[in-house]
Amino acid sequence: MSALTPHVGVRTLHDGTDAEPLLIADMSTIGGVFVAADADAAKFPLNVPVSFTTDDAAMVAAAGVAAGNTLAQTIEAISSEGVIARMVAVRVAAGSDATATLANVVGSSGAKTGAWALLEAGSETGDDPDILIAPGFTHNRVSNAANPVATAFDAICERLPTAIAVCDGPGTTNAAASEWAADFADTVNICLIDPPVR
C-alpha cells in the first residue's frame, strides 16, 4: 500500500538481486621506523619503505641481528607471539648521538625521509601501514615538549585514514606518563602504552 500513499521526492526501491561488492580493509600492516646498522642495505635501503612478512626468512636474515638493531628486535618480538605480520619498514641511519638519531627517525616531511617515508609506502610497496611504531624512540619528552616522533606520527596518521600510532610511554612514574599523554590529549591518532612494551 505504500505505493498508493502520496509521496514527494525520489523513491528508490532495491530488489535485492544486485550483487554487492564485499570490501575488506586490511587494518593490520605494521609500519615502523628502525635503526638497523647491520641490515642488508640492498634489501633495506635508508629512508625507503620496504614491505615484507615476518615469516620471510630471506628478509628476516637481511634485517640483521646486532645489538641496538630495533628492526631485528621488533621482528623477534612479533615472532615470539606466534603470529606472522606484514610490515613496512623504513630503516634510518644512527646519528652521532641520541639527538641526531632521533632527528633521523623523525625525518623530513618534504624529503619523505624517516617516519615521513611511511607516506610513500602505498605507492612504493602497495601496502599502506595501519599501526605505526618506532621502538625506542617515542618514550621521552624532548626539552620538556612533546615527543617529536609521536608528533610526526600524529600528522602522518591524518594522511593515512586507517592508521594509528602505538607509542611507548616513559615507563617511569604515573605523573610522567600523564604529562606525556597530555601532549596528545586532542588527538585520537596516538595510543600510549605505559609501561612500555618490552
Predicted feature descriptions by range:
Residues 1-198:
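Surface-exposed assembly/interface segments
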